[in-house]
Structures are given as structure tokens and as C-alpha cells.
Amino acid sequence: MGTRLLALAPWLLLLLLQLAGASHVVHRSLEAEQAPSSVPASIVSPLLRTGYHFQPPMNWINDPNGPLYYKGWYHLFYQYNPKGAVWGNIVWAHSVSQDLINWIALEPAIKPDIPSDQYGCWSGSATILPDGTPAILYTGIDRPNINYQVQNIAFPKNASDPLLREWVKPAYNPVATPEPGMNATQFRDPTTAWYADGHWRMLVGGLKGARRGLAYLYRSRDFKTWVRAKHPLHSALTGMWECPDFFPLQAPGLQAGLDTSVPSSKYVLKNSLDLTRYDYYTVGIYNKVTERYVPDNPAGDYHRLRYDYGNFYASKTFFDPVKHRRILLGWANESDSVTYDKAKGWAGIHAIPRKVWLDPSGKQLLQWPIEELEKLRGKSVSVSDKVVKPGEHFQVTGLGTYQADVEVSLEVSGLEKAEALDPAFGDDAERLCGAKGADVRGGVVFGLWVLASAGLEEKTAVFFRVFKPAGHGAKPVVLMCTDPTKSSLSPDLYKPTFAGFVDTDISSGKISLRSLIDRSVVESFGAGGKTCILSRVYPSMAIGDKAHLYVFNNGEADIKISHLKAWEMKKPLMNGA
């Protein structure tokens, strides 16, 4: 199936020699708990542990923190529990890579060891200072039981070390504390700072009252003393804003990224909404005089775009100076039970790193897996000009598909068969997908069944459903869904349908889909990255070489596979696992 390790590059061999006997001191001493008899054998099978998505060998991870590039290495820090597969005992674990795909774990970089973080080291960001030195801003918990939150700073102990293995915390920590009237238990996750007019600026997520989420704005002349501005950069009645992110964009359609301190006419403000556990963003204007952010869409704060319409949270972007791109990282939690996670001995993965840029329309971001992922592609098959009749499905054979990358261009010849969109659903894509799942026949509905068993008892559907235009001159409405309701026969799984509308004109009948299939995760990109959906699934039958791939048509019009190419994916170096 092609899951062997890639031949080690010279830089990997060198690093392994440097770190011999040092890596995974924490990990290797821990073992998964004995699986209770109530846990299905398939759940603890190593064949459900992802093959090419980021994760440590064992235990719990959540938010990606402080990604940066330094002296030839990409660094990723992440929230990690060194003692088990549930949240708790959080430290900043640390991994390095030279391609964002092959990773080697170092010792944790930041642990609770000063008064202002003695009860927890929570999320934060990295900033590269003018002399090239990185600095980390992060949230510390400094009181027991109540999660009282302050902001701290850390610097490399030895800036000449390209691996940044040791970090020190100045005695002047904390650098920002909640003031009277602020909710000290909802004050966290400082952003990458940006520099202009002699001042550094950063944002910290917060909550005012019961409902107003906000991005507190802080300024500093020396990156040491931080003062809160009189007003936040932006706020809205949405609930607590976690993990804010703020960055400039190139002109619409330009794929290059910008360093966070480079001024621009367009910006993205993103927050992770604590109430829904989804990541939302708006595109807008940053007024540098008033120091306020204004979304282009006045209703954008309440009808916001999402990076991903599936299981994707606590994301962080960074500017990659090597390839001049902005890269998005995000966390995908498990959709099984805590009992299952303890039995497995691990929980949580990160999405494949994505390049992000502004769509030519200027209204939304486009996202695409970084090009380095293609190095993992192995054996492939291609299908062209294959017609799938209504009610039929076509199996893609000739390769293993439980760890695969699939790109397909599809064409529907009968858009007049599309159903009318029931206005009762409004703009609620998720509810619409729940009512019009993959097995609901009629109209125009087509896509992929992935991680499917031979008899289709198990299958995860990634598909499009097209609806008639809402009015004269309007374009057809395209819904993209991931439907895992039949993904597994195992009990006690959370199997929600995920969905988002795709802002594309399908009047020509053409649309594309890419799905990254990786054992227990399906990460999909519709219409060139306009709509993205990540879903966690746990097949009990469609595992390993018993997993199959199909193109299906449950509509009333012919579907043509204009071109499909699928690759088996090799296993990269993944933190020693």
C-alpha cells in the first residue's frame, strides 16, 4: 500500500544523530491504558491512527501554537498533555521540520515553572523581532482552580541554536494582566505582533459581559511593557473569542503571502468561537489611525465565513519567508468517546498545513494543501471521461485507498434536474445537509464515497448537492457536504454531517473536489479550495485494504468523471511514531 517511511534525507539523518537518546523521553515512558472490553477492537487498531497527519506518538494534543521559520527549520509548538490522552497538564510541545511534512519531536519548550504560569501554559504565538530573534507570547494561568489568565513572554536561551531547544522567561513576566472590569477567566491567546509607527501591537482574545467577544489591542515600544488601548480592535455579540489571528493579504487572486507587519489594504480577522467550537473569519479594512478593524460585509460578524466547515478549531497562521506564503494550521479533535481515547492512548491531530490567499472576488480566502504534501504521493490510478448514470456508482480500483489523495473533476449534464431550495433552511448549510444527506435521492447530488466497505455497510460521503437558482439571473446554489452518518458500525461515536455553501458558478456543470483520506480523517477541498471540510471517522470494517473508493450519483442527471487521479500516500517521519 506504500505506507513505508520515505528514505531519510541528509538533514533528517543529521538531526537524528544530534538528538539520539534525547527525543521522546516523555513519550516513551507512557503506555496506553488497557482497552476496556466495551471498546471495539477496531477503535484501538493501529490502522485507525493517521498515517500522514501531524500528531505525537501518544497522548492528547490540541491547539497549534507559535509556528515559525528560523535558521532553516520550521518550528511547530502545540498544546500537549505528557501524562495522558485527555486534556490537562498542558505544556508547549515542540517539533521541527524542513518541509512541514516530516517532523521530529524535541523536548517541550514551555512548561509551568514560574509564578505567572504555574497552573498552565496555554496558547499563544511567535513573533520574529527586527534582529531576527523569535519571541513567544503565551497565556499563563497563575491561580489555582479559577483559570486566572495573564500574558507572558519567552525568548530562546541560545539564539544561535537553529532548533531553539531551550527557552527562558524574563523575570518581568507577566507582560499583560487583566485590569479591573475585565473578565480574567476569558483573557487569552495573544497573536503574532506587528510593528508600525514605532510600536508593536498584539491582540488578546476576550469576553465582555455575557456575549461580547472582542480582540483586545495592546501596544509596546520595547516588546516588554505592554499597554492596552482604550478600545478593542474589533468586537461583536458572538460570545468569547479564543485564538484570535490577524494578518494582511495580497491583492485578490495573488497567492503570495505577506509578513504580519507589512501594511495592506485588506486584512483577515479570525477568531475561534468558544460557543460553537468553530473558526470564523472576516475580510476587511484596518484603519491604522483609529486602530479599528471594519469587515467589508457589515453583517459579516454574524454571518461569517469559516476556514473549515467541519472539525477544525484553534487555528493559527504564519508567514513562511522561504516560499513567501501564508500557512494555516488547525486542530481536529476526536469524534469518539473519552473512554475510547484512553484505550487508544492518544487524541487529537492537526490538519494538513494549507496555503491561504484572497480569492479573485476579494470576498473570501482560498485554501489548498501545501505543495510539499505531494512528495508523499506513490502509486496512482487515473480515470477519464467515465459517465456515472443516475442511481449508480463507480469503484476506483488499482490502489489502496485508506491512505490516499484524490483529485477529481466532475461534470453534470442536467442542471435542470436540480431541486428548488427550501427557504426554510435559510443559509443553514449544516441543517440542510442533515435533511438532504448523501442517500437522499433525486435532483442533482454526486460525489465520493470514501473509506467504504465492500458491501457499503460503511461509507463516508463527500459530495455536492445543487439547487435551482433563487431568482432570475442568479447562479445555481451549490452545497458541499461530508456525511459520516454511515461511516462506522461502532457504537458511541459522534457522527455529525458537516456542510458549507460553495460560492462558485456551476452553470457550466463543472466542479472539482480534492479529498485527503487518512485512515480516521477525511479532509476535503471543494471548487479549488473555496469550501473545506474536515471530518473524523472510525470505520470498523473499511480499514486497511478493506477500504474502498467510489464515485456515486444519487441524482437524476448523468455525471461525468472528466478526470480523476488518486494516489496512495506514503508515511512521513512523524515525531518518532
Swiss-Prot record:
<dbReference type="Pfam" id="PF08244">
    <property type="entry name" value="Glyco_hydro_32C"/>
</dbReference>
<dbReference type="GO" id="GO:0004564">
    <property type="term" value="F:beta-fructofuranosidase activity"/>
</dbReference>
<keyword id="KW-0052">Apoplast</keyword>
<feature type="glycosylation site" description="N-linked (GlcNAc...) asparagine">
    <location>
        <position position="183"/>
    </location>
</feature>
<dbReference type="InterPro" id="IPR013148">
    <property type="entry name" value="Glyco_hydro_32_N"/>
</dbReference>
<protein>
    <recommendedName>
        <fullName>Beta-fructofuranosidase, insoluble isoenzyme 1</fullName>
        <ecNumber>3.2.1.26</ecNumber>
    </recommendedName>
</protein>
<dbReference type="InterPro" id="IPR013320">
    <property type="entry name" value="ConA-like_dom_sf"/>
</dbReference>
<feature type="active site">
    <location>
        <position position="63"/>
    </location>
</feature>
<dbReference type="InterPro" id="IPR050551">
    <property type="entry name" value="Fructan_Metab_Enzymes"/>
</dbReference>
<feature type="glycosylation site" description="N-linked (GlcNAc...) asparagine">
    <location>
        <position position="158"/>
    </location>
</feature>
<dbReference type="InterPro" id="IPR013189">
    <property type="entry name" value="Glyco_hydro_32_C"/>
</dbReference>
<comment type="similarity">
    <text>Belongs to the glycosyl hydrolase 32 family.</text>
</comment>
<keyword id="KW-0732">Signal</keyword>
<dbReference type="InterPro" id="IPR001362">
    <property type="entry name" value="Glyco_hydro_32"/>
</dbReference>
<dbReference type="GO" id="GO:0005975">
    <property type="term" value="P:carbohydrate metabolic process"/>
</dbReference>
<keyword id="KW-0326">Glycosidase</keyword>
<dbReference type="Pfam" id="PF00251">
    <property type="entry name" value="Glyco_hydro_32N"/>
</dbReference>
<feature type="signal peptide">
    <location>
        <begin position="1"/>
        <end position="22"/>
    </location>
</feature>
<feature type="glycosylation site" description="N-linked (GlcNAc...) asparagine">
    <location>
        <position position="333"/>
    </location>
</feature>
<dbReference type="InterPro" id="IPR018053">
    <property type="entry name" value="Glyco_hydro_32_AS"/>
</dbReference>
<comment type="function">
    <text>May play a role in sucrose partitioning during seed development and in stress response.</text>
</comment>
<keyword id="KW-0325">Glycoprotein</keyword>
<keyword id="KW-0134">Cell wall</keyword>
<dbReference type="GO" id="GO:0048046">
    <property type="term" value="C:apoplast"/>
</dbReference>
<keyword id="KW-0378">Hydrolase</keyword>
<keyword id="KW-0964">Secreted</keyword>
<dbReference type="InterPro" id="IPR023296">
    <property type="entry name" value="Glyco_hydro_beta-prop_sf"/>
</dbReference>
